[in-house]
Amino acid sequence: MKTNIYMAKKNIPMQPENFELETNTVWAFPDRGKWATHDAKYRGNWSPYIPRNVILRYSKENDAVLDQFVGGGTTAVEAKLTNRNFIGVDINPNALEITKSKLNFECEFNPTISIMRGDARNLSSIADNSIDLICTHPPYADIIHYSEDIDGDMSLMPMKDFLFEIGKVAEECYRVLKKDKFCAILMGDTRKKGMVKPLAFETMRIFEAAGFKTKEIIIKEQHNCKATGYWKTNSIKFNCLLLAHEYLFIFKK
């Protein structure tokens, strides 16, 4: 296929080199991950090292993995490379097209992959207790807008509305996930008028209220937060520190 030819010409490996599973609760990936079809063009997407670690630790080959905020397709690519069946959902048609293009390569595995438009708050097409692992990266309320006016796009919601709606997401996660299986959610905090708004821990409490138990709280360092230019000026002006970490919550049903 054309994608494989392009990767060969650019000498892009199909799998990461010298990969090792993370063994503690602080993760840092200065290298974004340069294998297969991964890139950082989709704003706010996560490093492929994150879903790879989650998928390899909390699932096995041929398991069903769900990402209901599929975005730029990073989790989808990692599911394919690790031989997991995959369901990718997003409310944004543009995200679905990007994900499909990212999956346009051949590798040694051929898992079942389904990419569909849908709403993470209502996964009616997915049966109860049918998913082995949820691995997803929701928007952080309205920090980054992924569309201008798509109805139901949670990236357009202010924090109060977002937290109400993430409760519906948590309930759907609990419904579709099998008992004793895991749900991984990456979430970050934000600031309003110089004060930290703990979006991540509010989200954690909401998932616990839906029935989940918190197995791990992982601090993920951000490496695109440089104290230069605009950010340095505002840090000094408002006397506040740059938020340079996110939280990866591992929940168990």
Describe each PLM feature range:
Residues 1-253:
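Class I S-adenosyl-L-methionine-dependent methyltransferase catalytic core
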